[in-house]
From Swiss-Prot:
Uppermost EC category: oxidoreductase
Gene3D superfamilies recorded: 3.40.50.740, ADC-like domains, Dimethylsulfoxide Reductase, domain 2
Biological process (GO), any one: respiratory electron transport chain
Cofactor(s) needed: [4Fe-4S] cluster; Mo-bis(molybdopterin guanine dinucleotide)
Name of this protein: Uncharacterized oxidoreductase MJ0006
Residues binding [4Fe-4S] cluster, per UniProt: C8, C11, C15, C43
GO cellular component: membrane
């Protein structure tokens, strides 16, 4: 038995988590007590995050659709098929979707491939705020020292460890004001003042000062809020949705809100999706797609619609880095081997590039990390 230190993939807080491994299988989790963010505390989602590794719909082999059914294929067959299809489309008709659930290295590799093809690329931030992270320097640790905490949206339901920091600050005497479009009991319970708003555009920030931190987890214009905060010397902490939403953005992949994301999908003929599942929300956004490739860890609703499905490794089966919501670069560590023929996302992308006759300039994870560093992206 061994214990592997890594980072929880459940949200953007970036909590440390220990995976308990026995006979090359993760059998449980244990608090990473020395981790600076969560100090050994993990929410229920974090404690159960390893269970996705053994999901009943876990992908283990490449699949190609033949006569309306997805059947097993070799990697060579699947990648050759994709490469041949790609050659039939103009760059304007080709779209690649990156993911805030994949590592920096995976997303960077995908961006390099897309740049070589001059195609379109984006990643969905869902209902998270769209942020210029160069303007953000606030950390999660700043929450406990704030005298006045304003929350726009909800950090208690999906980002429990940030919620915990807010509660600790409140116990020290901080005033907590929460603005939300829904009247949730968990928000009312933890607020000194709860304000229901029809729109997040109606949030009143007239009383912010140097002792204020504004925590945002809602689709708002963060630039305007940052401007107001700077004028009053307040701090702003945007909260991203996924474990590496921030990383995907900093790597240089356009961050798309839900409407922008769906519009991009609707205008794509060749669509390659890495680690996302838009069909779960609306299958109709894919109705104009002529050829669909899905690269993922399980058979999702989107993968079921695909012409080719490529099995990738999950967070516990690879090395790499995530960037959390306050821009900390953190290393994830491989704990177990992947099932079947599943491959790391970056390696799948490199292999596809080779089928297209393109050299992306890297042969290892370390090569990618050096390239990222050389280009001063992170």
């Amino acid at each position: 038995m061994k214990v592997v230190h890594t980072i929880c993939p459940g949200c953007s807080v970036g909590c440390g988590i220990d995976l308990i491994v026995k006979d090359d299988k993760v059998v449980g989790t244990y608090p990473y007590k020395r981790h600076p963010i969560n100090e050994g505390k993990n929410c229920s989602n974090g404690k159960n995050s390893y269970k996705i590794i053994y999901h009943e719909k876990r992908l283990k082999k490449p699949l190609i659709k033949k006569n309306g059914k997805l059947v097993e294929a070799t990697w060579d067959e699947a990648l050759s098929f994709i490469a041949e299809k790609l050659k039939n489309y103009n760059a304007d008709d080709i779209t690649f979707i990156a993911s805030g659930k994949c590592t920096n290295e995976d997303n960077y590799a995908l961006k390099k491939l897309v740049d070589s093809l001059k195609a379109k690329i984006g990643h969905c931030i869902c209902n998270s705020p769209k942020v210029n992270y160069a303007e953000v320097s606030t950390t999660i640790d700043d929450i406990e020292n704030a005298k006045n905490i304003i929350i726009i949206g909800d950090v208690f339901s999906e980002h429990a460890l940030i919620g915990r920091k807010v509660i600790k600050a409140k116990e020290k005497g901080s005033k907590v004001t929460i603005f939300n479009t829904e009247e949730k009991e968990i928000l009312k319970l933890n607020a000194d003042e709860f304000v229901k708003v029809d729109s997040y555009l109606g949030v009143d920030l007239s009383n912010v000062d140097k002792n204020t931190i504004i925590i945002i987890n809602a689709p708002v214009n963060v630039d305007e809020i940052i401007k107001t905060a700077k004028e009053n010397k307040a701090k702003v902490l945007p909260v991203a949705k996924h474990c590496n939403t921030v990383g995907a953005t900093l790597i240089g992949i356009p961050a798309l809100n839900k409407d922008e994301y769906f519009e991009l999908l609707k205008n794509s003929k060749f669509l390659y999706i890495m680690g996302e599942n838009p069909a779960l929300v609306d299958k109709d956004v894919l109705k104009n797609v002529e050829f669909l490739v899905v690269q993922d860890i399980i058979m999702t609703e989107t993968a079921e619609m695909a012409d080719v499905v490529l099995p990738s490794t999950c967070w516990a089966e690879k090395d790499g880095t995530f960037i959390n919501t306050d821009k900390r670069i953190q290393k994830i560590n491989k704990a177990v081997n992947p099932p079947g023929d599943a491959m790391d996302d970056w390696l799948i992308i490199k292999s596809l590039a080779e089928k297209l006759g393109s050299d992306l300039g890297f042969n290892s994870l370390e090569d990618i990390q050096q390239d990222i560093h050389r280009n001063k992206l992170l």
